[in-house]
Amino acid sequence: MVKVIASSVRKGNVLDVDGKLYVVLTAQNFHPGKGTPVTQVDMRRIVDGVKVSERWRTTEQVERAFVEDVSFQYLYEDGEGFHFMNPGNYDQVVVDVETMGDQKAYLQEGMSCILSIHEGIPLALELPRHVTLEITETEPVVKGQTASSSYKPAMLSNGVRTMVPPHINAGTRVVIATEDNSYVERAKD
């Protein structure tokens, strides 16, 4: 365990609070006009998945657990959870549905991901920044509709909705940012 000041806590960090491990979901520093600056942290308890919010003074000490970030390859999903393999030593790890969260929509067989592991237990998953998916359906473009936004809604092959430019049609492969489901560019393949 390492003691750090609260203002240095970031999303994905693992904190030890009162002997229990938590994964940080969001961390924001607030500097009010009067009073001391504070750090608002939303966390998920690793043992049971309960979400907790904490507020600390930015200079307060918190304990950050040692977490190892290891590259893994996604294999498949079954009743147990999501199976990943370490390409270096062929060890397999199962990640449960709660740990995956909304990221499961972007998993593709053979995809390389970074797993944060604490004492052999996978705590968090980091996907590649961009993935290539196919547009399954999109609305037709209305000619002359330039006064409004130039993007239109579209459904991706993984079931996620996003906004794409008017020239993108169903069947087109596009690059999507996994962090916020936004369109990046048309796929070059």
From Swiss-Prot:
Q: Which UniProt keywords apply?
A: Cytoplasm, Elongation factor, Protein biosynthesis
Which GO cellular component term is one of those annotated?
A: cytoplasm
Protein biosynthesis: present as a keyword of the record?
Answer: yes
SUPFAM superfamilies under this entry? Nucleic acid-binding proteins (SSF50249), Translation proteins SH3-like domain (SSF50104)
Entry's SMART domains? Answer: EFP, Elong-fact-P_C
Q: Where is the signal peptide?
A: none
Gene Ontology MF annotations: translation elongation factor activity
Q: Which Pfam families match?
A: EFP, EFP_N, Elong-fact-P_C
The reply on keyword Protein biosynthesis is yes
Localisation: Cytoplasm
InterPro entries xrefs: Elong-fact-P_C (IPR015365), NA-bd_OB-fold (IPR012340), Rib_uL2_dom2 (IPR014722), Transl_elong_fac_P/YeiP (IPR020599), Transl_elong_KOW-like (IPR013185), Transl_elong_P/YeiP_cen (IPR001059), Transl_elong_P/YeiP_CS (IPR013852), Transl_elongation_fac_P (IPR011768)
Q: In which pathway does it act?
A: Protein biosynthesis; polypeptide chain elongation
* Gene3D superfamilies reported for this sequence: 2.30.30.30, Nucleic acid-binding proteins
The processes (GO biological process) annotated in the record are: peptide biosynthetic process
Question: What superkingdom heads the lineage?
Answer: Bacteria
Annotated coiled-coil segments of the chain: none
Q: Which NCBIfam families has this protein been placed in?
A: efp (TIGR00038), PRK00529.1 (NF001810)
Question: What does the protein in this record do?
Answer: Involved in peptide bond synthesis. Stimulates efficient translation and peptide-bond synthesis on native or reconstituted 70S ribosomes in vitro. Probably functions indirectly by altering the affinity of the ribosome for aminoacyl-tRNA, thus increasing their reactivity as acceptors for peptidyl transferase.
Protein family membership: Belongs to the elongation factor P family.
Q: What is this protein called?
A: Elongation factor P
In its UniProt entry, the species of origin is given as Rhizobium leguminosarum bv. trifolii (strain WSM2304)
